[in-house]
Protein backbone atom coordinates (compact mmCIF):
# COMPACT_ATOMS: atom_id res chain seq x y z
CA UNK A 1 0.00 0.00 0.00
CA UNK A 2 2.87 2.37 0.76
CA UNK A 3 4.12 1.74 -2.76
CA UNK A 4 0.75 2.74 -4.24
CA UNK A 5 0.79 5.90 -2.14
CA UNK A 6 4.29 6.76 -3.35
CA UNK A 7 3.36 6.25 -7.00
CA UNK A 8 0.02 8.07 -6.67
CA UNK A 9 1.41 11.14 -4.87
CA UNK A 10 2.84 12.95 -7.93
CA UNK A 11 -0.40 12.42 -9.83
CA UNK A 12 -2.47 13.75 -6.91
CA UNK A 13 -0.19 16.76 -6.42
CA UNK A 14 -0.21 17.64 -10.12
CA UNK A 15 -3.97 17.25 -10.27
CA UNK A 16 -4.38 19.42 -7.18
CA UNK A 17 -2.21 22.09 -8.83
CA UNK A 18 -4.58 22.08 -11.81
CA UNK A 19 -7.60 22.14 -9.50
CA UNK A 20 -6.28 25.17 -7.58
CA UNK A 21 -6.50 27.19 -10.78
CA UNK A 22 -10.18 26.28 -11.09
CA UNK A 23 -12.84 24.74 -8.88
CA UNK A 24 -11.30 22.37 -6.32
CA UNK A 25 -14.69 20.96 -5.29
CA UNK A 26 -15.59 20.09 -8.89
CA UNK A 27 -12.23 18.39 -9.43
CA UNK A 28 -12.67 16.52 -6.16
CA UNK A 29 -16.02 15.21 -7.37
CA UNK A 30 -14.50 14.14 -10.69
CA UNK A 31 -11.61 12.32 -9.02
CA UNK A 32 -13.95 10.55 -6.58
CA UNK A 33 -16.20 9.42 -9.45
CA UNK A 34 -13.24 8.21 -11.51
CA UNK A 35 -11.89 6.32 -8.50
CA UNK A 36 -15.26 4.69 -7.94
CA UNK A 37 -15.39 3.53 -11.58
CA UNK A 38 -11.75 2.36 -11.48
CA UNK A 39 -12.53 0.15 -8.45
CA UNK A 40 -14.91 -1.97 -10.52
CA UNK A 41 -13.33 -5.32 -11.47
CA UNK A 42 -15.12 -5.21 -14.82
CA UNK A 43 -13.46 -1.90 -15.72
CA UNK A 44 -10.03 -3.17 -14.72
CA UNK A 45 -10.62 -6.30 -16.78
CA UNK A 46 -11.60 -4.27 -19.84
CA UNK A 47 -8.63 -1.94 -19.32
CA UNK A 48 -6.20 -4.86 -19.32
CA UNK A 49 -7.76 -6.54 -22.35
CA UNK A 50 -5.64 -6.42 -25.52
CA UNK A 51 -8.85 -6.37 -27.58
CA UNK A 52 -9.81 -2.91 -26.29
CA UNK A 53 -7.80 0.12 -27.35
CA UNK A 54 -6.52 2.59 -24.79
CA UNK A 55 -8.64 5.32 -26.36
CA UNK A 56 -11.73 3.15 -25.85
CA UNK A 57 -10.82 2.57 -22.20
CA UNK A 58 -10.39 6.32 -21.66
CA UNK A 59 -13.71 7.00 -23.34
CA UNK A 60 -15.39 4.33 -21.21
CA UNK A 61 -14.08 5.90 -18.00
CA UNK A 62 -15.11 9.42 -18.97
CA UNK A 63 -18.54 8.25 -20.11
CA UNK A 64 -19.13 6.52 -16.78
CA UNK A 65 -18.76 9.69 -14.70
CA UNK A 66 -21.37 12.42 -14.27
CA UNK A 67 -19.06 15.34 -13.49
CA UNK A 68 -19.24 18.23 -15.99
CA UNK A 69 -15.43 18.31 -15.89
CA UNK A 70 -15.28 15.02 -17.81
CA UNK A 71 -15.21 17.10 -21.01
CA UNK A 72 -12.30 19.22 -19.73
CA UNK A 73 -9.10 18.74 -21.75
CA UNK A 74 -7.00 18.36 -18.60
CA UNK A 75 -9.35 15.71 -17.22
CA UNK A 76 -9.17 13.82 -20.50
CA UNK A 77 -5.36 14.08 -20.43
CA UNK A 78 -5.26 12.71 -16.88
CA UNK A 79 -7.40 9.72 -17.77
CA UNK A 80 -5.50 9.07 -20.99
CA UNK A 81 -2.15 9.26 -19.17
CA UNK A 82 -3.32 6.83 -16.48
CA UNK A 83 -4.67 4.42 -19.11
CA UNK A 84 -1.54 4.66 -21.28
CA UNK A 85 0.73 3.99 -18.30
CA UNK A 86 -1.46 1.16 -16.91
CA UNK A 87 -2.11 3.19 -13.75
CA UNK A 88 -5.90 2.87 -13.44
CA UNK A 89 -5.61 0.90 -10.18
CA UNK A 90 -3.99 4.04 -8.72
CA UNK A 91 -7.13 6.16 -9.10
CA UNK A 92 -8.58 5.30 -5.65
CA UNK A 93 -5.28 6.23 -3.98
CA UNK A 94 -5.01 9.40 -6.09
CA UNK A 95 -8.50 10.32 -4.88
CA UNK A 96 -7.51 9.74 -1.24
CA UNK A 97 -4.40 11.88 -1.58
CA UNK A 98 -6.28 14.59 -3.48
CA UNK A 99 -8.79 14.76 -0.60
CA UNK A 100 -5.93 15.02 1.90
CA UNK A 101 -4.45 17.94 -0.04
CA UNK A 102 -7.88 19.57 -0.25
CA UNK A 103 -8.45 19.13 3.48
CA UNK A 104 -5.00 20.51 4.29
CA UNK A 105 -5.72 23.60 2.21
CA UNK A 106 -9.08 24.08 3.95
CA UNK A 107 -7.59 23.42 7.40
CA UNK A 108 -9.90 20.44 7.74
CA UNK A 109 -9.58 16.72 8.32
CA UNK A 110 -11.67 13.59 7.89
CA UNK A 111 -12.68 11.95 11.15
CA UNK A 112 -13.91 8.40 11.61
CA UNK A 113 -16.17 8.08 14.63
CA UNK A 114 -16.93 4.50 15.65
CA UNK A 115 -19.66 4.30 18.26
CA UNK A 116 -21.30 1.46 20.13
CA UNK A 117 -24.70 2.96 19.30
CA UNK A 118 -26.03 5.10 16.43
CA UNK A 119 -25.34 8.81 16.95
CA UNK A 120 -28.25 11.17 16.28
CA UNK A 121 -28.13 14.76 14.97
CA UNK A 122 -27.60 16.91 18.08
CA UNK A 123 -25.48 14.25 19.77
CA UNK A 124 -23.22 13.98 16.71
CA UNK A 125 -23.01 17.76 16.32
CA UNK A 126 -21.97 18.17 19.97
CA UNK A 127 -19.34 15.44 19.64
CA UNK A 128 -17.93 16.93 16.42
CA UNK A 129 -17.84 20.43 17.96
CA UNK A 130 -15.95 19.04 20.97
CA UNK A 131 -13.51 17.17 18.71
CA UNK A 132 -12.96 20.28 16.56
CA UNK A 133 -11.89 22.18 19.69
CA UNK A 134 -9.57 19.34 20.71
CA UNK A 135 -7.96 18.86 17.29
CA UNK A 136 -8.10 22.60 16.41
CA UNK A 137 -9.43 22.09 12.89
CA UNK A 138 -12.68 21.61 11.03
CA UNK A 139 -13.67 17.95 10.93
CA UNK A 140 -15.68 16.04 8.33
CA UNK A 141 -17.24 13.12 10.21
CA UNK A 142 -17.95 9.59 9.04
CA UNK A 143 -19.86 7.54 11.60
CA UNK A 144 -19.82 3.76 11.96
CA UNK A 145 -21.52 1.57 14.54
CA UNK A 146 -19.60 -1.25 16.24
CA UNK A 147 -21.51 -2.87 19.10
CA UNK A 148 -18.35 -4.65 20.29
CA UNK A 149 -17.20 -1.32 21.78
CA UNK A 150 -19.92 -1.85 24.44
CA UNK A 151 -20.14 1.91 25.03
CA UNK A 152 -18.30 5.13 24.21
CA UNK A 153 -16.56 6.03 20.96
CA UNK A 154 -13.29 5.51 19.10
CA UNK A 155 -12.24 8.56 17.07
CA UNK A 156 -9.60 8.47 14.33
CA UNK A 157 -8.27 11.71 12.82
CA UNK A 158 -5.39 11.02 10.44
CA UNK A 159 -2.96 8.91 12.43
CA UNK A 160 -4.32 9.99 15.83
CA UNK A 161 -6.71 7.67 17.68
CA UNK A 162 -8.78 8.67 20.70
CA UNK A 163 -10.38 5.56 22.19
CA UNK A 164 -12.85 6.21 25.00
CA UNK A 165 -14.78 3.00 24.50
CA UNK A 166 -15.73 0.67 27.34
CA UNK A 167 -13.89 -2.14 25.54
CA UNK A 168 -10.64 -0.11 25.59
CA UNK A 169 -11.09 0.72 29.28
CA UNK A 170 -11.71 -2.95 30.11
CA UNK A 171 -8.61 -3.96 28.15
CA UNK A 172 -6.61 -1.33 30.05
CA UNK A 173 -7.90 -2.64 33.39
CA UNK A 174 -7.09 -6.22 32.37
CA UNK A 175 -3.54 -5.20 31.50
CA UNK A 176 -3.16 -3.37 34.82
CA UNK A 177 -4.52 -6.30 36.82
CA UNK A 178 -2.38 -8.95 35.10
CA UNK A 179 0.84 -6.92 35.24
UniProtKB/Swiss-Prot annotation:
Membrane spanning stretches: none
Predominant cellular place of this UniProt entry's protein: membrane
Localization in the cell: Cell inner membrane
Question: Which molecular function GO terms apply here?
Answer: proton-transporting ATP synthase activity, rotational mechanism
Q: Which InterPro entries match?
A: ATP_synth_OSCP/delta_N_sf, ATPase_OSCP/dsu
Record keywords, A-Z? ATP synthesis, Cell inner membrane, Cell membrane, CF(1), Hydrogen ion transport, Ion transport, Membrane, Transport
The signal peptide annotation in the UniProt record is none
What is the topology of this protein in the membrane according to its UniProt annotation? Peripheral membrane protein
Offer one Pfam family short name for this entry.
Answer: OSCP
Gene3D superfamilies (alphabetical) = N-terminal domain of the delta subunit of the F1F0-ATP synthase
Identify the GO cellular component terms for this protein: plasma membrane; proton-transporting ATP synthase complex
> How does the record describe its quaternary structure?
F-type ATPases have 2 components, F(1) - the catalytic core - and F(0) - the membrane proton channel. F(1) has five subunits: alpha(3), beta(3), gamma(1), delta(1), epsilon(1). F(0) has three main subunits: a(1), b(2) and c(10-14). The alpha and beta chains form an alternating ring which encloses part of the gamma chain. F(1) is attached to F(0) by a central stalk formed by the gamma and epsilon chains, while a peripheral stalk is formed by the delta and b chains.
Q: Which PANTHER family does this entry report, sorted A to Z? A: ATP SYNTHASE DELTA CHAIN
Function statement = F(1)F(0) ATP synthase produces ATP from ADP in the presence of a proton or sodium gradient. F-type ATPases consist of two structural domains, F(1) containing the extramembraneous catalytic core and F(0) containing the membrane proton channel, linked together by a central stalk and a peripheral stalk. During catalysis, ATP synthesis in the catalytic domain of F(1) is coupled via a rotary mechanism of the central stalk subunits to proton translocation. This protein is part of the stalk that links CF(0) to CF(1). It either transmits conformational changes from CF(0) to CF(1) or is implicated in proton conduction.
Similarity remark? Belongs to the ATPase delta chain family.
Q: What is this protein called?
A: ATP synthase subunit delta
| Species of provenance | Paraburkholderia xenovorans (strain LB400)
